[in-house]
Structures are given as C-alpha cells and as structure tokens.
Amino acid sequence: MIEITVNDRLGKKVRIKCNPSDTIGDLKKLIAAQTGTRWEKIVLKKWYTIYKDHITLMDYEIHEGFNFELYYQ
C-alpha cells in the first residue's frame, strides 16, 4: 500500500491509500468516494501530464508520497 496526496488547489487536500497495481481509474473512484464527486468528472494532472484511466500507478512510476493536482471537467 502506498499513500498519495491529491490537491484541487481550492483548499481540498485528500490522502488516498492504494496499491501500485491499481489503475488511475481505480484511484479516481477512491478519490470520488472521499470527495463526493463523480469519478468521471475527475482529471488527474501533474504539471502538464494528464494521467490516463487504464494505466497502472506502477507503470507511471508513482510512489509513496506522490502529489497529484485534481481538476474537474
């Protein structure tokens, strides 16, 4: 299990525990469960990289303590 921080830059900061084998789509569903938004509306970015739903955290080399930027579409 790794812990990831998600910040929407509007004051909401969420910590999520997940497995490295989880996909970005799975992570979005965990974020949606904690924030109360629909997972389809969540966009995860870091700088200018937009993370795709079907790729795993391990493939993106996301590790313990990683910070995502949370956007809504």
From Swiss-Prot:
GO CC terms in record: cytoplasm; cytosol; nucleus; transcription regulator complex
PANTHER family reported for this sequence: UBIQUITIN-LIKE PROTEIN 5 (PTHR13042)
The entry's keywords: Cytoplasm, Ubl conjugation pathway
Description of what induces expression: Expression increased by citrate dietary supplementation.
Molecular-function annotations in GO: protein tag activity
Subunit structure: Interacts with dve-1; the interaction occurs in a mitochondrial stress-dependent manner.
PROSITE patterns found in the cross-reference section: UBIQUITIN_2 (PS50053)
Localization, UniProt: Cytoplasm
Record note on disruption phenotype: RNAi-mediated knockdown inhibits expression of hsp-60 when adults are exposed to conditions causing mitochondrial unfolded protein stress.
Described purpose of this protein according to its UniProt entry: Involved in the mitochondrial unfolded protein response (mtUPR). Plays a role in modulation of lipid metabolism in response to the citrate-induced mtUPR, acting upstream of transcription factor nhr-80.
Protein name from the UniProt record: Ubiquitin-like protein 5
Primary residence: cytoplasm
Domain Ubiquitin-like: 1-73
Gene behind the chain: ubl-5
GO BP annotation list: mitochondrial unfolded protein response; mRNA splicing, via spliceosome; positive regulation of gene expression; protein modification process
